[in-house]
């Protein structure tokens, strides 16, 4: 089951929300757990055995680590055992092997996300950042909570533990959640799915022209953002409907003026996870300059490997790791107060080049695309491409980049760092390996929760209601479009 499907919109979600709000407060976590298991079992019922095993294992390991004491040798041994067992399936997936627990079943959808969350839980217990919970229902609901289950954000128990017991349910929060969900749905169905056809066709061409290659690269760059951030918006919106407030996962990443800044804004829950549980574990920046560069590179290399064993993901991770190390080495200002078009264009070029190899099935396809992009030969589209490209697809691509430019620049000038004479707000600038963690909001389409940092003209009542009305109309149009198209899963399902 996926969010962008009729069965979820018109069957699962209404039934769940109805039962949820009819239930008493003490039963809502149990109902959430059961609903999440139904959501997950929609793919394969036998996946639930693995799901339950992972949950019980990490619940037990957490108790053992907690009982052994913070950062003690016995706790370290329990932690190591927990991480090794948790990682078996992920490591076998990365190696291209069959998962260990379920014979003849591919690694279940979403396992990387809930394994990451389970590992972060037992590490936090070991470090003393959160106590080991004895409430099995709350812990199981945390692992299984369906809004983020398939493609994140990567949640942490220490951030949600209090919300499982003390979250609030208000009409404003529910309305905010509905708006956020609809925004994500529009991103996915209206924009990402339309651009997917363009990107797929361009990457499949055997002899692309320079124009074909750049069209495919730019279409995929926009598709991936609107697809993945759309899922995150829907997940965050669903959480708000249930009283939860999840961390933001995107903050207008394509406005970045460095790769370091890009990783503060892109897939924030994963980048902060890699920083807190991998980069810092490797030593961070505490063991000398060269070691810092090595740790940055290894963190991103392993981040690429997390996506799969395909050499393209590894090269993509190495590409980003290399530029992170270079920017660190030259002392680049990664929190600029002014917008520099040259720096932005160079950063965007690096990101697009990375997405080409990320999207390519193999190095041969990537080489074919790069060769066409930088041969600067025929800029016109091939006849095959012109025959398949529609006016709607072109218009969608233009609207996508206009949207990215408008909201990106608005975010930059609204939330840019303070003057050097004033201490910068770490919640706005810290979310990359080597820095301190921070919760970051993406003002992009968001209404309500970011009002404190938005200009007065944006938080006035009339534009808010006008935007919500526009979102509702586009949401209805997206549902009609969904009914007429074939099934289109989110891109990050494969990871």
From Swiss-Prot:
Q: Which residues form the active site?
A: 307
A cellular component term (GO) from this record?
plasma membrane
- What is its membrane topology? Multi-pass membrane protein
Annotated membrane-spanning segments are 7-24, 39-61, 101-123, 136-158, 296-318, 344-366, 387-409, 471-493
Q: Does the keyword Metal-binding apply?
A: no
Q: In which pathway does it act?
A: Glycan biosynthesis; alginate biosynthesis
Which Pfam families does the UniProt entry name for this protein?
MBOAT
Q: What terms describe the molecular function in GO for this protein? A: acyltransferase activity
Q: What is its EC number?
A: 2.3.1.-
Per its UniProt entry, which superkingdom is the organism in?
Bacteria
Where in or outside the cell is it found? Cell inner membrane
Q: What task does this protein carry out?
A: Together with AlgJ and AlgF, forms an inner membrane complex which probably interacts with the alginate polymerization-transport complex and adds acetyl groups at the O-2 and O-3 positions of mannuronate residues. Acetylation of alginate is important for the architecture of biofilms and increases the ability of alginate to act as a defense barrier.
What's the protein called, per UniProt? Probable alginate O-acetylase AlgI
Q: Which gene encodes it?
A: algI
């Amino acid at each position: 089951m996926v969010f962008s499907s009729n069965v979820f919109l018109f069957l699962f979600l209404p039934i769940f929300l109805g039962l949820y709000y009819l239930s008493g407060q003490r039963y809502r976590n149990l109902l959430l757990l059961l609903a999440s298991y139904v959501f997950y079992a929609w793919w394969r019922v036998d996946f639930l055995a693995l799901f339950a095993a992972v949950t019980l294992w990490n619940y037990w390991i957490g108790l053992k680590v907690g009982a052994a004491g913070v950062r003690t040798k016995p706790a370290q041994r329990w932690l190591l055992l927990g991480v090794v067992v948790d990682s078996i399936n992920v490591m076998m997936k990365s190696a291209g092997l069959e998962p260990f627990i379920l014979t003849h079943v591919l690694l279940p959808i979403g396992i990387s996300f809930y394994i990451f969350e389970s590992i972060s839980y037992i590490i936090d217990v070991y470090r003393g950042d959160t106590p080991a919970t004895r409430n099995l229902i709350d812990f199981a609901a945390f692992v299984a909570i369906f809004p983020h289950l398939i493609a994140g954000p990567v949640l942490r128990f220490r951030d949600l533990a209090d919300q499982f017991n003390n979250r609030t349910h208000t009409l404003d929060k529910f309305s905010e959640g509905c708006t956020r969900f609809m925004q994500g749905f529009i991103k996915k169905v209206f924009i990402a799915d339309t651009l997917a056809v363009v990107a797929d066709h361009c990457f499949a061409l055997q002899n692309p022209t320079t124009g074909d290659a750049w069209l495919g690269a730019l279409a995929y760059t926009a598709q991936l953002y609107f697809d993945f951030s759309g899922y995150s918006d829907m997940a965050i919106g669903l959480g708000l409907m249930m009283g939860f407030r999840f961390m933001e996962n995107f903050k207008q990443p394509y406005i970045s003026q460095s790769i370091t800044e890009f990783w503060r804004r892109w897939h924030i829950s994963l980048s902060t996870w890699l920083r807190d549980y991998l980069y810092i574990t490797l030593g961070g920046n505490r063991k000398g300059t060269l070691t810092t560069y090595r740790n940055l590179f290894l963190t991103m290399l392993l981040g690429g490997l997390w996506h799969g064993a395909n050499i393209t993901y590894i090269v993509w991770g190495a590409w980003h790791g290399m530029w992170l190390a270079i920017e660190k080495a030259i002392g680049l200002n990664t929190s600029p107060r002014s917008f520099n078009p040259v720096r932005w264009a160079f950063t965007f070029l690096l990101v697009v080049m990375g997405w080409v190899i990320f999207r390519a099935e193999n190095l041969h396809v990537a080489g074919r695309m790069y060769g066409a992009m930088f041969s600067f030969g025929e800029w016109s589209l091939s006849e095959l491409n012109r025959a398949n490209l529609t006016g709607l697809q072109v218009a969608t691509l233009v609207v996508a980049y206009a949207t990215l430019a408008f909201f990106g620049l608005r975010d930059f000038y609204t939330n840019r760092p303070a003057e050097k004479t004033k201490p910068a707000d770490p919640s706005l600038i810290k979310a990359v390996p080597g820095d301190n963690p921070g919760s970051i909001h993406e003002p992009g389409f968001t209404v309500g929760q970011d009002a404190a940092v938005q200009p007065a003209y944006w938080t006035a009542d009339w534009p808010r209601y006008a935007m919500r009305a526009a979102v509702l109309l586009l949401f209805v149009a997206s549902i009609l479009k969904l009914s007429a198209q074939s099934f289109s899963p989110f891109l990050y399902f494969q990871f």
